[in-house]
């Protein structure tokens, strides 16, 4: 088993030659930029994040701007990244920093950990990467490197497995160069010790990696227990009036919280009944091509029902909704399936 000191030495020796140093959030490593990038990178690939990060920073360059921005704008900038609770928590945390810390990002681990949406690893990344403070991290990439190198059995989502990995992470994190070490660990996981087809021959840790020695990299980290995802159906009502389409804002919590979506119904009968209640004729209702959208915990089969020449009336004057202009789209957050359907309507 590789000793902690040797592990850290090999990682720090590898980074200057092969690590990533030109990512947009590495140009100016402020706590705000590191925080934003770390949150965006959760469950999302670097290549996907880069343009979102750049657009976000252009519009909301600091924590004060983020706190002052309407949530709709934050969600709009996030549209397409998914896991929208991340955006809502960013906004909430920025407002907390302004209210409780006079707009200065806290530099205490406990104060950062108390902010909405920030866990132990993200807090450690913020402090180590931007300020050089001695904190370990354990994101998905780091879990994979450690699980393979030390042959840690079990799925990292299990508390005891995660605790074991945290202990190893703390043991191997060096006293000096912690920011560079943590960045190197994330880079190793992303570039070398990848989920499939890892480049073991290029890894600085291969001389002491237990998975490499036993030709068992595919075994680590352990897989999440297989679960059959339940299936649900939703009928989306696409009401169009010229270049405008009616959207309703979802409640602030729950699925697609705070985003704008089409009116949604579990059954076609419910949709027709709602139209009848609003005094809207359903004779021109057309079904568009259905498609599936998969969440982490269920499949949603979406059946789009399109109705043209619907004029504003009744509930459609409600402040909880808006007529979305396809020609001049407003800056609001959209669920991915909604954005897809709006693009489809705009092309018609």
Write out the residue ranges for each language-model feature:
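Intrinsically disordered, low-complexity, charged terminal extensions of DNA damage-control enzymes
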Residues: 1-22, 26-27, 190-348
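Catalytic cores of DNA base-excision repair glycosylases
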Residues: 3-201, 205-218, 231, 280
